[in-house]
Amino acid sequence: MANLGIIGYGIVGKAVEHTFKDNNILYYDKFIKSTPLKEVVEKSEFIFICLPTPFKNDKIDLSIIDENLKEITKLTDNTNKIIIIKSTVVPGTTIKYSRLYPKTKFCFSPEFLREAHYLEDAVNPDRIIIGADDLDVRKRVISLFKKRFPNVLMFETDPTSAETVKYMANCFLATKVIFANEIHDLCQKLKIDYNKVKEMVIVDKRMGSSHFGVTNEKGFGGKCFPKDIVALIGLYKDLNLDPTLLETVWKKNLKIRKVKDWEDIPFVKSD
């Protein structure tokens, strides 16, 4: 059994705990009764960062992770402990932390969870992605995951590529939702049944059947898609790239979404 620490006990933190429940696990969350941060880090070989990354001023807000890493790295510097970032962070973040704390070992490994089925998804992954530049870190993290998921497709890569995978997946699915809503509107105008059209489309193996549903609320909401598409738009602007498509998707969502639930969900949007 491995000694694991979880920092942040929300959906992602609980998913990590559920995944590795046969190991020795401690968790810290400042908002609930939990083990003190110092004890979690000192007693853990692998420390999973499962903290919120809300958006603020049209870009990602990493302040919660920043605040925690300042304390965590005091205990991980010059040790064999590995910090595994599970939080969704914009590409380049893990490298930034590696340079800021060069005596600590970092890895990025994204989660791909549906909010309503996060425990089920956590133990039935399509693939596992391990992003680390240090080959020894890769080897140790892969060994941890291989013991739990011996038959799951596993990718080894650098942390920035791993971070990009998460944003590509989430923002593509958000775009797919908006496209489905637009075709739904067309079908209504033409007085035809969208669900019948959809049924004939999704048998095409290239399409994938998920995220074609259109809800009464329209568009997308929740904890992930809104903050992630805003964060990626912000990164594009920081890199002087053109985010026209992403901006169009987000603006369309703001226009059609009846319930902007992300405004009220804690840690999705910072004040």
Spans of model-derived segments:
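Rossmann-like NAD(P)(H) cofactor-binding subdomain of soluble oxidoreductases
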Residues: 46, 54-117
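NAD(P)+-binding Rossmann beta1-loop-alpha1 motif at the extreme N-terminus of oxidoreductases
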Residues: 1-46
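Internal alpha-helical scaffold of NAD(P)-dependent oxidoreductase catalytic cores
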Residues: 24, 98-107, 114-210, 235-242, ...
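NAD(P)-dependent Rossmann-like dehydrogenase/reductase catalytic/cofactor-binding core
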Residues: 2-3, 43, 188-271
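Structural motif
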Residues: 30, 46-50, 86-88, 129, 131-134
